[in-house]
């Protein structure tokens, strides 16, 4: 490992027939290499919850796979620090233009730049969709129906939960009965107990949060030590990110993963794509492929499709419907904060150890469509100081409030937003370091969002007050997970991809990430993205076996 002029360590590189082993200090694993001019079955752009999972499952099905990612390949045991500022290296901080009535804040909790994508810094909350959300128009009267059946998705949820060894409660209080989680639930910290006391006082159910972080040993990975820096990268590998789960499996099965490889444009000839142009090590390359999968998430996926416009596809690839970039959904993430009489020390452990989904499953007593859950919180000190500064606290006032840090508690929602065509991603006039137009992200809340926010604040305030909190205040303009922009559906006129995540326009172009969501639900999306990726891999194998997909499995 080399260092730059400041003494900062450069990340290890996947090259020369080997890949960094994230589970061993200084470790390496053998990795198959492909030539750029050697057509592989699949080139995948992105290695997060969608692309990393799909790379693993396709390679295990016997296909030749090259996965490209703009981010670095880290070994968490030696390269992740207990330092919020240092770990900003995991975020996608490239320039984007954000406008609209409610411009989004991008670059931290809703995007990632690393092998493993944003799963490297996600909060590990792993929740299934409510079954009715897959047919929200038919069953609940809003949004659109998915082209997927919830019972099939339930099987893939189980596959992902087993693959990640999700730690969760013996019985989950909402939805259809399900098997026990693979690992026991984590011990609750004091912040989670605040949520529990408040929910019980309100007479609503709560539960320990199902988390993709280990509560017991798994091979060379240690269980969670309650270090508390989960959203800044897990230094012990307890977090079951794509970096330490799907990616090592993909490499072992014969996939090549190329780090620091920025996709520039997808090449198309007629009604087929032929590969991906990308920038790596100061040179532009072209990887030939029989199929291209885009898995760059809800901003970079539509951006790449739009950047790849040509004479035959002047609006961008897969965009005959004109819907690429449209129907962006940013889940609501408002919070109620308060001060407790006793110390909470909310930084101890994963940030969301308890939750309630009561308002996801209760359809009465609401003046809005959709639902939300709320979770216990544990912001780190710098993040908390930023929140206080945003309230206008500076100087001595900020110091006094920070002195109460260990006595704080809070609840935060993940709330469903409705798909609106005007919330969208387009290309701006400004250009990035590669000379490409940056993404313009236009976003606005609607009346349904505002009604949900008011309802959530009223309920969370009741819960905090019942738990003994005082000096309650609101963080009222925040969003989290992104979805939509390349929606799936049953009609090529109203969607971009079909149920198998395959472009309606170009049969060897696939999209596999949260951008395919027609609706977003009121829970974290990572489990659903990974379940869709597992399903897509199986569907590709089925389609290829009957000659409907251009790929040839080779058992290694």
Report the location of each language-model feature.
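Redox-cofactor-proximal catalytic regions of oxidoreductases
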Residues: 85-174, 234, 345-348, 414, ...
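Conserved redox-cofactor binding core of oxidoreductases
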Residues: 137-263, 481, 487
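N-terminal Rossmann-like FAD-binding beta1-loop-alpha1 element of flavoenzymes
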Residues: 42-67
């Amino acid at each position: 490992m080399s260092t730059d002029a400041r003494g900062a360590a450069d990340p290890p590189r996947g090259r020369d027939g080997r890949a960094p082993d994230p589970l061993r200090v200084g470790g390496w694993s053998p990795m198959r290499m492909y030539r750029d001019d050697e057509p592989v079955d699949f080139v995948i752009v992105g290695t997060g919850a969608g692309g990393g999972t799909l790379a693993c499952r396709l390679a295990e099905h016997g296909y030749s796979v090259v996965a490209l990612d703009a981010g670095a390949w880290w070994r968490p045991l030696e390269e992740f620090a207990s330092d919020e500022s240092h770990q900003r290296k995991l975020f996608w901080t490239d320039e984007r233009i954000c406008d609209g009535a409610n411009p989004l804040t991008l670059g931290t909790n809703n995007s990632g730049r690393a092998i493993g994508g944003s799963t490297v810094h996600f909060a590990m909350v792993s929740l299934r969709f409510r079954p009715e959300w897959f047919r929200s128009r038919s069953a609940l009267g809003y949004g659109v129906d998915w082209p997927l059946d919830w019972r099939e998705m339930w099987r893939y949820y189980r596959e992902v939960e087993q693959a990640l060894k999700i730690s969760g409660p013996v019985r989950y209080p909402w939805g259809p009965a399900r098997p026990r989680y693979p690992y026991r639930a984590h011990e609750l910290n004091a912040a989670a107990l605040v949520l529990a006391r408040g929910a019980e006082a309100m007479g609503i159910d709560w539960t320990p949060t199902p988390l993709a972080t280990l509560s017991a040993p798994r091979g060379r990975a240690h269980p969670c030590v309650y270090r508390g820096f989960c959203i800044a990268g897990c230094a012990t590998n307890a977090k079951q990110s794509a970096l330490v789960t799907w990616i090592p499996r993909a490499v072992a099965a014969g996939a090549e993963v190329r780090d620091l490889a920025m996709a520039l444009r997808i090449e198309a000839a007629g009604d087929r794509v032929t590969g991906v142009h990308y920038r790596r090590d100061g040179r532009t390359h072209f990887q030939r492929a029989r199929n291209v999968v885009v898995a760059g998430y809800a901003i970079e996926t539509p951006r790449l499709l739009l950047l790849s416009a040509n004479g035959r596809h002047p609006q961008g690839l897969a965009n005959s419907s004109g819907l690429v970039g449209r129907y962006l959904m940013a889940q609501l993430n408002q919070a109620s904060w308060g001060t407790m009489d006793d110390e909470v020390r909310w930084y101890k452990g994963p940030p969301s150890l308890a939750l309630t989904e009561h308002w996801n499953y209760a359809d009465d007593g609401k003046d809005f469509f959709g639902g939300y859950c709320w979770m216990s919180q544990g912001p780190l000190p710098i993040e908390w100081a930023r929140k206080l500064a945003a309230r206008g606290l500076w100087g001595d006032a900020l110091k006094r409030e920070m002195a109460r840090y260990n006595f704080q508690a809070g609840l935060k929602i993940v709330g469903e937003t409705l798909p609106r065509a005007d919330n969208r991603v387009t290309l701006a006039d400004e250009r990035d370091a590669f000379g490409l137009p940056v993404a313009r992200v236009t976003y606005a809340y609607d009346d349904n969002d505002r009604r949900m926010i008011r309802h959530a604040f009223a309920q969370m305030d009741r819960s905090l007050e019942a738990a003994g909190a005082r000096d309650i205040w609101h963080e009222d303009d925040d969003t989290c997970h992104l979805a939509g922009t390349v929606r799936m559906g049953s009609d090529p006129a109203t969607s971009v991809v079909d149920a198998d995540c395959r472009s309606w326009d170009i049969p060897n172009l696939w999209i596999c990430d949260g951008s395919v969501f027609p609706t977003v639900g009121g829970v974290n999306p990572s489990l659903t993205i990974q379940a869709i990726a597992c399903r897509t891999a199986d569907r590709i194998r089925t389609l290829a076996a009957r000659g409907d997909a251009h790929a040839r499995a080779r058992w290694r």
